[in-house]
Amino acid sequence: MRYLPEVDPEIYEAIKSEEYREEYHLELIASENFVSRAVLEAQGSVLTNKYAEGYPGKRYYGGCLYVDKVEDIARERVKAIYGAEHANVQPHSGSQANMAVYFVVLNPGDRVLGMNLAHGGHLTHGSPVNFSGKLYNFYFYGVDKNTEMINYDSVWNLAKELKPKLIVAGASAYPRIIDFEKFAQIAEDVGAYFMVDMAHIAGLVAAGLHPSPVPYAHFVTSTTHKTLRGPRGGFILCKKEFAKEIDKAVFPGIQGGPLMHVIAAKAVAFKEAMSPEFKEYQKQIVLNAKAMAEELIKLGYRLVSGGTDNHLMLVDLRDKGITGKEAEKALEEAGITVNKNAIPFDPQPPTITSGIRIGTPALTTRGMKEDEMRYIARLIHEVLSNFKDERVKEKVKKEVEELCKQFPIYRKEN
């Protein structure tokens, strides 16, 4: 950085501190990842200067020749990755993408069936504190109490009873494969629209490691970060018949000017996602998650649903004498970043929780593999078994720093 230290030393110091945290801490938050230098460069480019309300070839401002090219490239790439008929890459976030779909198919008060947030869903799938729960009449399906997996017969029975206008599938904390074909059959049976929020698994879907929702859903939304390893942002895929309505819902419906520098960064991430290396990376994410899950089970931890099929796992801490909130704090003090997370049928409030969510995308980006995952699982166990012992946390923190030195993120490129 050449100019920031002089112009704004406070922000410069905060950024440098965050760089250090990312380099020397173990990032296990399932929704986080490390973008490439190319993505960072695109997002920090002069495209941030350009206003471009509208769509390529139909802008409300002049001077859009080059940003049109950028957006066209991004749209074509993401359509190619997922085999979609239409794509909108303008949503600023996954929440905005979901809002746009809701605005297309729903009126205030319409019935929607989505996954319970407490069972692994997402705020925008009908939480009463979110716009989705305030505007629409959401009902919820969850996981089976015994298997802790989605029971599709129960979903079908709920759908038959409620006759929702829209069914939403997708999750933020569900460690198993989701059967989108079954959901589509349920939606068809009750005459509902079907939307999938694949934000967490978009990278796995791109690599063919999770069944794609695109052939089955009327609408698919996603973020571009998480497993897709792009900038923070969103996109929508849909059938051609909904293309005009979706585009109108995004602009002028819920957004004004698109963030062209972010769309450029999305395009770069999409190109990276089309490479053979990306597929291998996604395979390793899953291998790493399975290795860590197996090691945690060996160490005596109960995982929700008994394991994982994807990039994340939920650890039930109820028999360990520690809450999710306490675990998150203790691990952070030892240089390991996770997030407290509700488990299905959690007796604790969402601000405390009985579990933690662990994900492997970011550490896999660093080049870590199964052996490192097993080692990290043991470090997690050491901290959680002694979460009030400052000496243990300090010891683990040093071990974490030594491990991080072997797998640099951006230091090797400086």
From Swiss-Prot:
Instruction: Note one Pfam family from the annotation.
Output: SHMT
Signal peptide (residue range): none
What CDD domains does UniProt report for this protein, alphabetically?
A: SHMT
First-tier enzyme category under EC? transferase
List GO terms (cellular component aspect): cytoplasm; cytosol
- Looking at the UniProt record, the site noted as Plays an important role in substrate specificity sits at 225
- Gene3D superfamilies per UniProt: Aspartate Aminotransferase, domain 1, Type I PLP-dependent aspartate aminotransferase-like (Major domain)
Reaction equations catalysed: (6R)-5,10-methylene-5,6,7,8-tetrahydrofolate + glycine + H2O = (6S)-5,6,7,8-tetrahydrofolate + L-serine
Which positions does the record annotate as the modified residue N6-(pyridoxal phosphate)lysine? 226
Cofactor(s) recorded for this entry are: pyridoxal 5'-phosphate
- Annotated (6S)-5,6,7,8-tetrahydrofolate binding lies at 117, 121-123
Annotated compartments: Cytoplasm
Q: What is its EC number?
A: 2.1.2.1
InterPro entries with a match to the protein in the record: PyrdxlP-dep_Trfase (IPR015424), PyrdxlP-dep_Trfase_major (IPR015421), PyrdxlP-dep_Trfase_small (IPR015422), Ser_HO-MeTrfase (IPR001085), Ser_HO-MeTrfase-like (IPR049943), Ser_HO-MeTrfase_PLP_BS (IPR019798), SHMT-like_dom (IPR039429)
Keywords of the record? Amino-acid biosynthesis, Cytoplasm, One-carbon metabolism, Pyridoxal phosphate, Transferase
Pathway field of the UniProt record reads:
One-carbon metabolism; tetrahydrofolate interconversion; Amino-acid biosynthesis; glycine biosynthesis; glycine from L-serine: step 1/1
Instruction: Please list the GO biological process terms of this entry.
Output: glycine biosynthetic process from serine; tetrahydrofolate interconversion; tetrahydrofolate metabolic process
Q: Which GO terms describe its molecular function?
A: glycine hydroxymethyltransferase activity; pyridoxal phosphate binding
**Which proteins does it associate with, and in what oligomeric form?**
Homodimer.
* Protein family according to the UniProt entry: Belongs to the SHMT family.
Q: Which HAMAP family match?
A: SHMT (MF_00051)
Q: What NCBIfam families is this protein classified in?
A: PRK00011.1
Record function comment: Catalyzes the reversible interconversion of serine and glycine with tetrahydrofolate (THF) serving as the one-carbon carrier. This reaction serves as the major source of one-carbon groups required for the biosynthesis of purines, thymidylate, methionine, and other important biomolecules. Also exhibits THF-independent aldolase activity toward beta-hydroxyamino acids, producing glycine and aldehydes, via a retro-aldol mechanism.
Q: What is this protein called?
A: Serine hydroxymethyltransferase
